[in-house]
């Protein structure tokens, strides 16, 4: 009787455990493929959108700010406006891109607003993977510096290039710009050209004036990237009426959107120095 009871109990335990084991194996079979898929997925960006931080404080140009903001929104980023440069270090934490666009004719006072602490915060942000876009006055700010009436104005040095006026005239014009191999009629007003200096970071020359001088370029900065342009690819059609000669102007906004998207991308700056 004891043996029979033991046998019966063992049989009962075995038969009762079959569905439990089957359920366990079925669950494992379902979980394992999911685990494999999870491991094969790319890592999710913890800050997938961020924002573009656009400087709108003293010396900046409101029309340029408005045009750049429209371009950045087309490129898929929300825009946050920064009117006090002292707040820059704190605002960079959530920014994917920092922008300085067109400015007043005298951009040197803006350079002087960058204290060592502000400049250091911006350079750390870039070296850790941040982005900077400078157009016209903002491109001067990002350069190594420029000569001005016998003096040399030292700028931030975000790109390995010195800057200089293209034509020494502050009146708005339409110039032929060879942008990525295609000649475009583009708005220009006292923006810089660039002369590359010896450096270790890769640089890609994006555009040229008709005399062959560099009009726009992109450079690596540590893990980050910097793009600068003397002419204004973001200019809307309404700006044409302001130009000195009233020449025709191409619609270049798609080029500006493409520039922002390329700057934001993870693709490296491919042309080595």
Where are these regions (language model features)?
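Class I SAM-dependent methyltransferase SAM-binding "motif I" and its flanking Rossmann-like core
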Residues: 143-185
